């Protein structure tokens, strides 16, 4: 199970390279077969990782756990996540992954970080919280010192405290939770196509908007989001944030600078409570439905934010459904502005989150690389673009793979068929992330790690695969080189502790696995 020593690897490679007989002649040579198999293993994610003796023992145990899950009559990665989730939560492999240090989460959206139960059971019970009900059976929330002004296509605002006295609070809370997530008992019936699921997906963000943008809640929400990721053994987070205006109880609006200062304040407070947490940074995002003039303004805002908040401002991105938004090439004049002014504004573009081959949107990955993106968000379409894939590899641009998101949003049904399985087998630069975990009733990274580890890698992926993915998460982060080195050293120390205390101590091994 462990990676071979480099000497033996090179020897096997020599067998392949120096053996001059054609593959098709005579009887197949077992040595050549073994060499080719090892060459495939070496090329994959984790293929260059050499496991120590402790890791080899742990890897053997992990292999046995994987065999148990593979033998199940229902294999979770082949099922829709909403149906697979209970099976995943019973899996000892999932328990292993929960306890494993996972490094960084590099693709997470601001309004989908925190479990919706916390939003409903905590935030909606606070004073001055109003609700209205829309014509399409959704809800909106607003905090106000007095009766809010009527909102188009919504009922009269009702103080939640008053409403709860008139009806069953449990049923009301459950209805709010349903509006804040995409969960459905029969997801294929509820979401027959991408248009339907994307409409529901974007509506869920609108439901959360009035809660999360209330200034006091904004800070509490961010703190709770960091806490939930930290409890999943994540030490660093990069948050894609729209930075909409937050509002006060009297209706006053705050600027983006206020939001960034709030992020700094929350992060400082969080690190004081959890000193081993490395930190968090913001990738400022705008919707890809903007016109060019609006995009220019947004890029200029990003440059200003980077100048004013260099410690937490990581870069810029567009969000929203690629298939219904404008392609990156449309925005090139806006995106070229920083370089023309001698300013380096890092880009972290969503690209290739589509199955619409041959369209303008299908060129977004190529254009992202031409615009010198630091990473590619999703990259689902990459295996259909060999030149893009080769260029991304040469530029060392990692793909942020979000398995559950791609499945729920109907790009793929069986995760064994996800294009990232090919990227993983080829050792393409990649990280695993969770995109919008709260909307999928997931949390942190463990669920997505499970789907990738079991679905993409099958029995070939092992502890070395996991270790490489975890280290990649810091390697491809926006941290400075010095901070990356420091964070990676801390991560590897946590990794060693994870091995020793949780899985190699005989008194704990059975309890933990």
Identify the meaning behind each predicted range.
Residues 2-513:
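Metal-cofactor-binding active-site regions of metalloenzymes
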């Amino acid at each position: 199970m462990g990676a071979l020593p480099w000497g033996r690897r090179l020897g096997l490679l020599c067998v392949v390279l120096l053996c001059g007989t054609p593959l098709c002649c005579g009887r197949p040579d077992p040595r050549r077969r073994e060499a080719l198999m090892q060459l495939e293993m070496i090329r994959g994610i984790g293929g260059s990782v050499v496991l120590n003796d402790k890791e080899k023992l742990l890897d053997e145990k992990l292999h046995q756990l994987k065999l148990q899950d593979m033998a199940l009559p229902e294999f979770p990665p082949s099922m829709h996540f909403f149906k697979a989730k209970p099976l995943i939560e019973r899996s000892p492999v999932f328990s292993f992954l929960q306890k494993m240090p996972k490094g960084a989460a590099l693709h997470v959206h601001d309004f989908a970080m925190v479990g919706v139960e916390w939003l409903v059971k905590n935030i909606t019970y606070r004073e001055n919280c109003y609700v209205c009900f829309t014509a399409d059976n959704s809800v909106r929330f607003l905090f106000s010192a007095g009766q809010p002004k009527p909102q188009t296509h919504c009922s009269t605002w009702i103080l939640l405290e008053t409403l709860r006295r008139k009806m069953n609070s449990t049923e009301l809370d459950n209805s709010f939770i349903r509006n804040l997530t995409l969960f459905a008992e029969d997801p294929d019936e509820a979401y027959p196509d991408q248009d339907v699921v994307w409409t529901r997906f974007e509506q869920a963000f609108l439901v959360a908007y009035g809660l999360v943008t209330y200034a006091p809640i904004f800070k509490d929400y961010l703190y709770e989001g960091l806490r939930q990721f930290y409890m999943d053994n994540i030490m660093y987070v990069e948050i894609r944030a729209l930075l909409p205006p937050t509002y006060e109880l009297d209706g006053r609006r705050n600027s983006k600078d206020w939001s960034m200062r709030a992020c700094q304040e929350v992060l400082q407070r969080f690190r004081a409570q959890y000193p081993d947490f490395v930190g968090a940074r913001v990738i400022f995002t705008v919707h890809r439905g903007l016109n060019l003039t609006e995009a220019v303004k947004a890029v200029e805002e990003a440059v200003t934010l980077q100048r004013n908040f260099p410690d937490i401002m990581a870069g810029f991105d567009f969000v929203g459904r690629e298939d219904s938004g404008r392609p990156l090439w449309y925005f090139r004049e806006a995106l070229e502005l920083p370089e023309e002014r001698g300013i380096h504004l890092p880009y972290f573009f969503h690209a290739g989150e589509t199955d619409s081959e041959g369209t303008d949107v299908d060129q977004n990955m190529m254009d992202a690389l031409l615009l010198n993106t630091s990473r590619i968000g999703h990259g689902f379409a990459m295996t259909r673009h060999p030149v893009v894939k080769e260029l991304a590899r040469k530029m060392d641009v990692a793909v942020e793979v979000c398995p559950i998101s791609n499945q729920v949003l109907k790009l793929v049904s069986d995760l064994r068929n996800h294009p990232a399985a090919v990227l993983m087998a080829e050792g393409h630069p990649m990280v695993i992330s969770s995109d919008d975990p709260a909307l999928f009733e997931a949390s942190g990274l463990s669920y997505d790690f499970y789907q990738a580890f079991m679905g993409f890698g099958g029995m070939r992926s092992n502890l070395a695969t996991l270790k490489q993915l975890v280290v990649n998460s810091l390697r491809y982060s926006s941290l400075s080189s010095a901070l990356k080195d420091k964070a990676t050293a801390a991560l590897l120390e946590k990794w060693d502790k994870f091995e020793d205390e949780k899985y190699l101590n005989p008194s704990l091994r059975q309890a933990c696995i």
